[in-house]
Structure formats: C-alpha cells, structure tokens
C-alpha cells in the first residue's frame, strides 16, 4: 500500500548500455560545471546551467516535462509534513551535530549564505530579497539541478537500482557541498550533510520533488527570519 502524499512509480525499465553511458556523460559534465564555477570560477553560476540541462534532458530522454517530478502529489498535507520534518532534522543537525564534527575535524568557516546575500538584522528589504532568492534560485533551482537531475543521472549509471540511488545521493551530496565552496571547508561539510538529509527525504518519499523543494525553502526561510529578528547571528 502506498503512503499518502507519494506517487506510485512503476518499476523502472532496464536501461540500455548506451543510455547508461549517456547518463554517465551527463553526470560528469554536470559535476565538472559545479567544480568549474565554485572552485575555479571558470564558468557562470552552475544552478541556472543545471536547471536548463535538466529541463532539456528530461524532456528529450523521459518524454515530457511531467517527468520533472513536480506534479500534484496525492496529499499536499502529507507532502508538507514530510518536508517540515526534514527541515526540523536539518536545523537540529545544524545546531547540535555538525558544529562539534566541524570543530573536531578542524574545518573553517568563510562566510554564510545569509552574509553573501547581504542579510542584516532588522533590514526588511534584505530579508525579502533573501526569501525571494531562496524560493526561486535555491528551493526550485538547486533541487531540480542537484536532486532531480544530477542524482537521477548518477542513479541511471547503476541502472536505477535502490543501491544506485543511495550511492548517487552520497555523490551528489558531495557536489552540493562543493556548490557552497565560498563558505569554506566547514560550510562545504555542513551543506553536504544538509543535502544528504534533503536527498534522503526525496528518495524515501518515492522521489517526490515537492518534498525537497519545500524542505529547502523552509530551512532557509527559518534561518533568514531568525537572523532578521535577531534570534540568530
């Protein structure tokens, strides 16, 4: 029996060697773009590029834009609940789990996403701008680019088996961390952990992309509002 809020997925058809090879090429190109922008600053921001690649690739290879994974879920209530629980887990990790690990490993912070967006306590314009970017560029752009596209293509390489999806999640979480290279080694590690939790929720909800999008948006919204109100630095 399916859980409410999830979509029943037919067992994936086996992929041909050619299809798997093409997915390997796509994943390699996507990963190279992430590194080229964030580490070497050799190409423009990777998120819009991955977003366009995702739209084109999914349309051509999977037949329709519906395959993107943003169709109407069976239950919005359950979808939002899963996203909210995911957000709570990520925020709790950020308070109690990753900081001691970061300290133990001797990792360093550079600057936070809030700092890069110019978010300041009591500044209404800065928080509105940050929230606008969060719910477009980050929540939709990053989740489609990283969780839907790169994770999907990485899993294709292993013929979309359950194990392949979880190995793909580890790989894409590492790339997601590198996507926040500007935050320093501590930021890379922390965002990789956050990306893993969001990605795990995505997989456990039977690849309901709304779970990842809403969780990502909720996490950033709570953090930004806390900074705006002075509850957090």
Model-found features: residue ranges?
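Residue-level signature of transmembrane alpha-helical entry/exit and packing/kink sites
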Residues: 19-27, 46-50, 75-83, 126-131, ...
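Juxtamembrane helix-loop-helix connectors linking adjacent transmembrane helices
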Residues: 67-138, 156-159, 231-233
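Alpha-helical transmembrane segments in multi-pass membrane proteins
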Residues: 18-67, 78
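Transmembrane helix-loop junctions in multipass membrane proteins, especially transporters and channels
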Residues: 42, 62-63, 99-107, 181-185, ...
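Structural signal for membrane-spanning alpha-helices in multi-pass inner-membrane proteins
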Residues: 33-37, 53-61, 90, 94, ...
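Transmembrane helix-loop-helix hairpins at the membrane interface
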Residues: 123-233
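Short helix-terminus and kink motifs of transmembrane alpha helices
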Residues: 63-66, 95, 99, 143-148, ...
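Short, Lys/Arg-rich, polar N-terminal cytosolic tail immediately upstream
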Residues: 1-18
């Amino acid at each position: 029996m399916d859980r409410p809020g999830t979509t029943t997925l037919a067992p994936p058809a086996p992929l041909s060697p050619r299809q798997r090879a093409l997915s390997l090429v796509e994943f390699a190109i996507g990963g190279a773009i992430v590194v080229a922008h964030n580490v070497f600053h050799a190409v423009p921001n990777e998120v819009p590029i991955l977003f366009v690649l995702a739209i084109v690739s999914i349309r051509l290879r999977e037949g329709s834009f519906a395959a993107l994974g943003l169709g109407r879920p069976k239950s919005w209530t359950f979808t939002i609940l899963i996203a909210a629980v995911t957000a709570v887990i990520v925020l709790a990790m950020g308070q109690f789990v990753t900081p001691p690990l970061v300290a133990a490993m001797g990792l360093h912070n550079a600057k936070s996403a809030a700092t890069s967006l110019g978010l300041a306590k009591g500044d209404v314009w800065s928080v509105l701008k940050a929230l606008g970017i969060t719910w477009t560029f980050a929540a939709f752009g990053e989740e489609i680019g990283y969780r839907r596209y790169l994770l999907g293509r990485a899993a294709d390489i292993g013929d979309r088996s359950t194990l392949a999806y979880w190995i793909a999640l580890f790989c894409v979480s590492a790339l997601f961390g590198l996507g926040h290279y500007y935050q320093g080694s501590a930021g890379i590690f922390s965002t990789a952990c956050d990306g893993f939790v969001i990605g795990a929720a995505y997989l456990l909800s039977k690849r309901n992309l709304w779970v990842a999008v809403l969780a990502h948006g909720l996490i950033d919204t709570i953090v930004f509002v806390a900074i705006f109100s002075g509850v957090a630095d």
